[in-house]
C-alpha cells in the first residue's frame, strides 16, 4: 500500500453510517473500525480518504445485509489540502467495498473519487469513471 502525500483529516468516526457507491448490493455501511489506525487509549478510531475500514452492511440486498466486510473511503465532505495548495472537498461521504488487497468487489463506482485513493489503490482507480 502506497503512502498518501496529502495530509488527510480523519473526518469519519467509528459508528458513522456512510453510503456505498459501488454495485455490490450494499447501500449503507457502518464503520466498525479502521485498519492500521494508531491512536491513544480510549480514542475512537476515525477514517479519512484512502483509509481501509471494517464495515457492517446496514442497508442493501438481503444477501449483503448484516455482513462484515472491508471498504475504502473514496470521498469525504471535510476539506483537505493537497501539496500544491489546492483544497478539495466533496458533496458527500462515500465508500467502496473491497477485499484485503484493495481490489473492489463491484464492477462500477458511481460518482467521482479522490486522486489519493487512485494512487494508493490502482484497481479502484481503474474501476472509477471520474478521478478528481
UniProtKB/Swiss-Prot annotation:
Function noted in UniProt: Binds to 23S rRNA. Forms part of two intersubunit bridges in the 70S ribosome.
GO BP, one annotated term: translation
Statement: the UniProt record of this protein carries the keyword RNA-binding: yes
Subunit structure: Part of the 50S ribosomal subunit. Forms a cluster with proteins L3 and L24e, part of which may contact the 16S rRNA in 2 intersubunit bridges.
Family membership: Belongs to the universal ribosomal protein uL14 family.
Gene Ontology MF terms in the entry: large ribosomal subunit rRNA binding; structural constituent of ribosome
Keyword Ribonucleoprotein attached: yes
A GO term from the CC aspect: cytosolic large ribosomal subunit
Pfam families listed in its UniProt record: Ribosomal_L14
UniProt keywords, alphabetically: Ribonucleoprotein, Ribosomal protein, RNA-binding, rRNA-binding
Descriptive protein name: Large ribosomal subunit protein uL14
